[in-house]
UniProtKB/Swiss-Prot annotation:
Domain of life: Bacteria
GO molecular function (one): calcium ion binding
GO CC, alphabetical: extracellular matrix; extracellular space
Pfam family, one: Peptidase_M10_C
UniProt cofactor note: Binds 7 Ca(2+) ions per subunit. Binds 1 zinc ion per subunit.
Hemolysin-type calcium-binding repeat coordinates: 348-365, 366-383
Cross-referenced PROSITE patterns: HEMOLYSIN_CALCIUM (PS00330), ZINC_PROTEASE (PS00142)
Enzyme Commission number(s) from the entry: 3.4.24.40
Active site positions, chain numbering: E193
Annotated propeptide span(s): 1-16
Protein residues bound to Ca(2+) 6: G377, G379, D381, D399, D406
Protein name: Serralysin
Length: 487
């Protein structure tokens, strides 16, 4: 029997985005499509939900074995190891976390608490704690260990009668462990090991020091650092590009995993939150102040009217506001995603040629400078092209219904364009959309009506062949039928 699975081989050309109109929107809407029987790089593709379950396949939580979705209160500490010469693995040269390490570890803990119902409380070094942090410098035979990075134990790990759950250990010979920073591998290491201490496994059955595993050994295609910081493998295997930077906080599949274990934190960022430039998140990894400062994150947001502000970047960007989607931001690829169940309402592009795709909410999309492509999707959207030759794309009557119409706020006659080509494509007719002086009730009729008193043009279209138009866009400015449409 012939396989029904869709096979995709990741190459550079897979992610060469279309640059104009509907094709650019369609490319972005299908960017990093996953699950549903797809195979990528010869491996089964897992959905976000499947990946989250696989990362938690050991079924260990601090609430007990297979006790899922329940909140938890945990303690943590930074022991001084004054009276300990060897840890449980036989490593020596033990030392207390420095002030810098402690600060970065607390930020990593905070990033997990942001997305799940976990409360962390610090206790004194000598007190028993659920999660502990410590450095080592020599391996079991007594050699200075420059090969390993760190390791940790899942909850309820019992070895030779000892409960090792929650212990996390770090090789202080590694400079990024000794001096971790936001975009450095050290910060990711802290967040990764805390993930283990909370109950997360690697996305595949591998561990450092056990053989020589590679991406070819993965269980599913999305086992990369584009989808999970619990992964060992580069984001480039799935077409991402973090530009040599590393995530500091849980990524898309990590959020699904940790919320499966402890439930979602529905008190995180419930107000009107801005991510990127002009950020009010109070989180370093969700904020940037310059074109050279890149962001790598998965957005978890519990409410409010929220904005992706990537206005300070000069590279061409592709911004998708749909849940479980990926965006290319600040010259990187697939470096920003949105967790399941999250609605981000607004997006601001930079000075490059951007593609911005909205969702079913009432979006405000601003292209900024450059030749941008804007697609609001459902909802009553406000579209601002900004300077440059911009294209406003529509693909369904529901994108801009008369009762909830979109507004194009800054249309430039003879420069910008309105793309209705998908309606012709769907009707399999090159002239389905045709402009008329009045409606007769025939499907595909389009009419422009300009009101000079308020400088607003109504674009009405009868998509379904009803008695009245079922599609209406309000446009500030005049529109020329001959030059301003793509059909």
């Amino acid at each position: 029997m012939q396989s029904t699975k869709k096979a995709i081989e990741i190459t550079e050309s897979n992610f060469a985005a279309a640059t104009t109109g509907y094709d650019a929107v369609d490319d972005l809407l299908h960017y990093h499509e996953r699950g549903n029987g797809i195979q990528i790089n010869g491996k089964d593709s897992f959905s976000n939900e499947q990946a989250g379950l696989f990362i938690t396949r050991e079924n260990q939580t601090w609430n007990g074995y297979k006790v899922f979705g329940q909140p938890v209160k945990l303690t943590f500490s930074f022991p001084d190891y004054k009276f300990s010469s060897t840890n449980v693995a036989g490593d020596t040269g033990l030392s207390k976390f420095s002030a810098e390490q402690q600060q970065q570890a607390k930020l990593s803990l905070q990033s997990w608490a942001d997305v799940a119902n976990i409360t962390f409380t610090e206790v004194a070094a000598g007190q028993k704690a659920n999660i502990t942090f410590g450095n080592y410098s020599q391996d079991r035979p007594g050699h200075y260990d420059y090969g390993t990075q760190a390791y940790a134990f899942l909850p309820n790990t019992i070895w030779q009668g000892q409960d090792l759950g929650g212990q996390t250990w770090y090789n202080v010979n590694q400079s990024n462990v000794k001096h971790p920073a936001t975009e450095d591998y050290g910060r990711q290491t802290f967040t990764h090991e805390i993930g283990h201490a909370l109950g997360l496994s690697h996305p595949g059955d591998y561990n450092a020091g056990e053989g020589n595993p590679t991406y070819r050994d993965v269980t599913y295609a999305e086992d990369t650092r584009q989808f999970s910081l619990m992964s060992y493998w580069s984001e480039t295997n799935t077409g991402g590009d973090n530009g040599g930077h590393y995530a500091a906080a849980p990524l898309l599949d990590d959020i699904a995993a940790i919320q499966h274990l402890y439930g979602a934190n529905l008190s995180t960022r419930t107000g009107d939150t801005v991510y990127g430039f002009n950020s009010n998140t109070g989180r370093d990894f969700l904020s940037t102040t310059s074109n050279s400062q890149k962001v790598i994150f998965a957005a978890w947001d519990a409410g409010g009217n929220d904005t992706f502000d990537f206005s300070g970047y000069t590279a061409n960007q592709r911004i998708n506001l749909n849940e479980k989607s990926f965006s290319d931001v600040g010259g990187l690829k697939g470096n920003v995603s949105i967790a399941a169940g999250v609605t981000i309402e607004n997006a601001i592009g930079g000075s490059g040629n951007d593609v911005i795709v909205g969702n079913a909410a009432n979006n405000v999309l601003k292209g900024g400078a450059g030749n941008d492509v804007l697609f609001g999707g459902g909802g009553a959207d406000e579209l601002w092209g900004g300077a440059g030759k911009d294209i406003f794309v529509f693909s369904a009557a529901s994108d801009s219904a008369p009762g909830a119409s979109d507004w194009i706020r800054d249309f430039q006659k003879g420069i910008d364009k309105i793309d209705l080509s998908f309606f012709n494509k769907e009707a399999q007719s090159s002239d389905f959309i045709h402009f008329v002086d009045h409606f007769s009730g025939a499907a595909g009729e389009a009419l422009l009506s300009y009101n000079a008193s308020n400088n607003v043009t109504d674009l009405s279209v009868n998509i379904g062949g009803h008695q009245a138009p079922d599609f209406l866009v309000k446009i500030v400015g005049q529109v020329d039928v001959a030059t301003d449409f793509i059909v």
